[in-house]
UniProtKB/Swiss-Prot annotation:
Cu cation 3 binds at residues 189, 1008, 1048. Cu cation 5 binds at residues 657, 700, 705, 710. The gene is HEPHL1. Residues 25-207, 218-366, 379-561, 571-719, 731-907, 915-1092 form the Plastocyanin-like domain. GO terms for cellular component: plasma membrane. This is Ferroxidase HEPHL1.
Amino acid sequence: MPRKQPAGCIFLLTFLGLSGLVGTVTRTYYIGIVEEYWNYVPQGKNVITGKSFTEDKLATLFLERGPNRIGSIYKKAVYRRFTDGTYSIEIPKPPWLGFLGPILRAEVGDVIVIHLKNFASRPYSLHPHGVFYNKDSEGALYPDGTSGRNKNDDMVPPGKNYTYVWPVREEYAPTPADANCLTWVYHSHIDAPKDICSGLIGPLLVCKEGILNRYSGTRNDVDREFVIMFTLVDENQSWYLNENIKHFCTNPDSVDKKDAVFQRSNKMHALNGYLFGNFPEPDMCVGESVSWHLFGMGNEIDIHSIYFYGNTFISRGHRTDVVNLFPATFLTTEMIAENPGKWMITCQVSDHLQAGMLGQYNVDNCKSDIFYPKMKGQQRRYFIAAEKILWDYAPQGYNKFSGLPLNASGSDSDLYFTQGDNRIGGKYWKVRYTEFVDATFTKRKRLSAEEAHLGILGPVIKAEVGDTLLVTFANKADKVYSILPHGVIYDKASDAAPNLDGFVKPGAHVKPGETFTYKWTVPESVSPTAGDPPCLTYLYFSAVDPIKDTSSGLVGPLLVCKKGVLNADGTQKGIDKEFYLLFTVFDENLSRYFDENIQKFIWHPFSIDKEDKEFVKSNRMHAVNGYMYGNQPGLNMCKRDRVSWHLIGLGTDTDMHGIVFQGNTIHLRGTHRDSLALFPHMATTAFMQPDHAGIFRVFCATMPHLSRGMGQIYEVSSCDNRDPSEQRYGMIRTFYIAAEEVEWDYAPNKNWEFEKQHVDARGERHGDIFMNRTENWIGSQYKKVVYREYTDGEFVEIKARPPREEHLELLGPMIHAEVGNTVLIIFKNKASRPYSISAQGVEEMDSGKQFQVPMTKPGEVKTYRWNIPKRSGPGPSDPNCIPWVYYSTVNFVKDTYSGLMGPLITCRKGVLNEKGRRSDVDYEFALLFLVFNENESWYLDDNIKKYLNKDPRDFKRTDDFEESNRMHAINGKIFGNLHGLIMNEDTMTNWYLLGIGSEVDIHTIHYHAESFLFKIDKSYREDVYDLFPGTFQTIELFADHPGTWLLHCHVSDHIHAGMETTYTVLRNIDNRIPYSTTSPGVASHPATVPSNERPGKEQLYFFGKNLGPTGAKAALVILFIIGLLLLITTVILSLRLCSAMKQTDYQQVQSCALPTDAL
């Protein structure tokens, strides 16, 4: 080798190493915002049924033009992708993407550059979820203290351009447990709800390293990928509503935009902008791997239960065929398509299904040599009939909680159980699945004592992986019915779905008097995953008319179990008790037997008005297995029994259920809880080993559901022969807490809305109704009652809240305890009416025999004791500390809305320091997201007297008045008035998110600029967390992005109603610590919070990091050295190349370790 050859190799190695250092992929997109007309039903018919829309009254409401109806075509603004900066050639997208913007893809380490041009007639922006951005690339308008160049991204005027730069940093990477590509979105964020309803939203996929092709950007790990947005597109919120009225209504001057029916006609229940099966069908082949990227957007009623007929999939390590989506919920599900045919994709929420939220997908036999696994397990036979029955929702005749008769005048149950001139009462004709012993259907199978609790539910169907189920169905009722199962595999011969797919499906319509045998298989591909419980809970139901059939009563539980889990008699090994609970509002107005029930039970049936609101309400039965107000039998167990609870949801968008187990906790995928959320067609399995004997409630914590009867009793007996020694408790932590009445201001500063300048359809600011005091609106100040901590039992001196607790605001003190501790609450009631203090998740002494803790009268002092057993602390998969809540239970609804609520944090042993604060994190924050309904407060009359100066008895309580009293608050503050969410850069924070409330309290909590981890069995990455009544969660957020950032609920109405604030991450430039859970003392709160622009100090953006002066200097030195090395390398390579060309007589190629030496 020539003498200089090693030097050349060294320089080339240096060059390639430096290239790798700075060689991140920049993925550049040219995006234009264009206005166009969008048709929600381009095929002009219901593709699922094949019928014309004129044959469907409800479809006509949405799709037919008229004097005051827009029809199916609307003007929208959409994102479109172009080839280059001339924006002259559009890059086509797959038809199934609908009006969504193009799919943007990147993997960890890449940089996304968006060149946006606004071709529309009004300003818009582009804001991403799931990636890093600086203030000049956030694309969101809100009061964040920035100006100048950091405001230019907030809105792009018509005809203008803007470039957004989003590095995909490691902190936003999918976790090992996440799918290879996480689903995110981008959307315009000037007025996000209106911008999105106008059409400006698209998918953004962030993948693990090595998943994307470096040049094409396509995935190399799956065969197919599809993106679907499920949302109720509210065209009433569109910026183009007036144009659409003028252009499409045949008599636009007759339109009343406030009319409820007109508004409903503009709410499009769509998949990517398509209704009633007009969604272009995604195609795939049997055996292919498919990634479904699903997300929701919208409002309080955007609760979606997405059901993929015919196949199952994995979602966050869990096997299922249904996932739930909410506004700004993003999911990646992974499917192996194994079942050929045309299958439906639907939202199983009744109202949404009826309004057209359904499409189809095709699984083709692309190869002739497809292998189908042979079922080697048992053949399990069931003989099930549909039988008409007279059902009693409360056979014991009284409210088991209050002891009152169900028809007691003025009681909560009176509306549902009083029979009369315009009321049916508590008995209805229904239809139920009943099990028989054989195919003759002459002898019913006797229910055992363990099955007494099933009520209206059909028999439990169970199978293990490898089994075949043969279900013979006899229709002994008087209507056409069927059986359709979740969670198993069936071919088209046993398909009971009602869609037209080219197959004759006799099992889809079994007439009265007929029988049909369904064959369902349980191959390995539908098995519970390693992280799933031994048996997955599903349901089966009649699908001839799935809304009417299930409202009539046809639903039952189905279990799919791992191999070897079931005993010979069908019970689960290692389980002592199994209970199956269906939580649903049975809407008897939708039953097939509604007219018959009117004729049978109403005293004057011909005078009834079926549209009367109170009559309609009286027929909505808030039941558990068809029982109300504690009338369900059979929920009995022994202390230390191993109990498996199988919980099922069904119904419509108000069927949002937060199921709470009083007195004991449940185990969910490695976590400890006492509650879980249920939605239509969702089912889950939870385990309990009760350690607390007594009589307890299992109930829905969604506030109206609780008062309307959706609660039952379960009893835990000591069974002394099975009672182990009691757990001993060590440290006693004592707190002096009082309930006291205060004047509370939800919005002392009203500048937030003025800065955002959001207006509604009438040109008024959205916040006016909540913040302004008029002759009919109370304004932002209310009398309330709150928990406050005192220094000692004299209750004279309130314990001052340190700066780290400033953010608690309305909430009571943050109580910390470790497993094995006892919490002693010395409680004084300084208010004017009785209250109490009770905590979820703990072992409350003196409870369990009277359903609620003792009340404390005004002026009294009472002691409450809470033990923290192991099951009240974090589970194996939980973070070190988990949240619960404490509140008053004298009247849970009114007490809570009046203000009595606080956080209880339970931790593993050794986590708390000597001051009772966490030693393992830098900051902790507790946030309660709740629409405080002041109409339900104990103090409403007081507030009317004081702030309106009117007599409450004479005051007319209009709809506007009641709306003005619904405060969409975070810790009791609205429109940016919650302060104290401050932390330093590069610190670990834990946030305790608390959900309480009613059907409107669906909250999707979005953190701008940061992502976080939440744990189920493993850790998962998100920047939005879904919160529901009765549910609580710890999220772990590493704060590494300095600035003031938006924190808000992503539900459209909640944004406009002020459920927003900001949090601030301070730079470490001065080593300032505003306050920290781990600091030795409590530092003073900083006088001012610095903005994202530091006056007089230049900043350098370097590989996704803002550098101060010292860092910038070091970076410049490094760049200079790299540049010098590259220059030297280039010169040497050039000289060597010239030398090589001149040496024509050189015969032999010398080699070193690099193939590039041939140059």
